[in-house]
């Protein structure tokens, strides 16, 4: 096996170990949603929201960590932050800027928006996890976080689709999402341009994961605790 292959195998083992440790600490994987072999298992909406909120918080934590690490290692002195304003592919989706704005939106619309943002990240996260391996001397900590975020975003999307199906009467909502066409930017030959593309994508990921985290807390408070939070 090549050194790179051995390194990647070790990376994925590290992903499993660290993610299981962190998720267990957060209480996300403490119990299966339904016991194996159970029939007609019905998980409460409150429990579904508990898991979604914990998972979204974990994703935002990882997104902040990977952005900060990338910023410190590759972005210093390059002026990336001044160019990274309003450059997110999800900007086409009208999203509340904070909890106060989110509280003004009907819960079904806010649920659809959460699902739409999560769907919008499916494709870019898949390519982030693969293309980040091509960055010169990329540390394993950045690599495994990219892989882990992609996996956990899929888990959160699946959980949110269950919540939407439970909350919505009849129609499970429109399949809204924002298309991402940034793969060529992650493969540019010019190093500065390529690194900025990664920086901008991670900057947007941190921003959107924070929004999702806030929206889910608002939704949980409204739907589970009757806004008494």
Curated annotation (Swiss-Prot):
Q: Name one cellular component (GO) term.
A: extracellular space
Query: Record's InterPro entries?
Result: 4_helix_cytokine-like_core, Somatotropin/Prolactin, Somatotropin_CS
Ordered alphabetically, the record's keywords are: Disulfide bond, Hormone, Secreted, Signal
Q: List the disulfide bonds.
A: 34-41, 88-204, 221-229
Q: Which GO terms describe its biological process?
A: cell surface receptor signaling pathway; negative regulation of endothelial cell proliferation; negative regulation of luteinizing hormone secretion; positive regulation of canonical NF-kappaB signal transduction; positive regulation of miRNA transcription; positive regulation of receptor signaling pathway via JAK-STAT; prolactin signaling pathway; response to nutrient levels
What start and end residues bound the annotated signal peptide? 1-30
Pfam families in UniProt: Hormone_1
| UniProt GO molecular function | hormone activity
Any idea where this protein resides?
Answer: Secreted
PANTHER family from the entry?
Answer: PROLACTIN, SOMATOTROPIN,PROLACTIN
Give the record's family classification: Belongs to the somatotropin/prolactin family.
The protein in question is named Prolactin
């Amino acid at each position: 096996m090549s050194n790179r292959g051995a390194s990647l195998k070790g990376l994925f083992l590290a992903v499993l170990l660290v993610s299981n440790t962190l998720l267990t600490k957060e209480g996300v994987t403490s119990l299966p949603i339904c016991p194996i072999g159970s029939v007609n298992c019905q998980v409460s909406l409150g429990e579904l929201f508990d898991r979604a909120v914990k998972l979204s918080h974990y994703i935002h934590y990882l997104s902040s960590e990977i952005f900060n690490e990338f910023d410190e290692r590759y972005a210093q002195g390059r002026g990336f932050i001044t160019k990274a304003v309003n450059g997110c592919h999800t900007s086409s989706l009208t999203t509340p800027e904070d909890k106060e704005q989110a509280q003004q939106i009907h819960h079904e619309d806010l649920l659809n928006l959460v699902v739409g943002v999560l769907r919008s990240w499916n494709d870019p996260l898949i390519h982030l996890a693969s293309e980040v391996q091509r960055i010169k001397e990329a540390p394993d900590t950045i690599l495994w976080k990219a892989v882990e975020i992609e996996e956990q975003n899929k888990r959160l999307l699946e959980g949110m689709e269950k919540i939407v199906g439970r909350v919505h009467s009849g129609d499970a909502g429109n399949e809204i999402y924002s298309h991402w066409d940034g793969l060529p930017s992650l493969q540019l030959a010019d190093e500065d341009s390529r690194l900025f593309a990664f920086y901008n994508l991670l900057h947007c990921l941190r921003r959107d994961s924070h929004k999702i985290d806030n929206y889910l807390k608002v939704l949980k408070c409204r739907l589970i605790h009757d806004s008494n939070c």
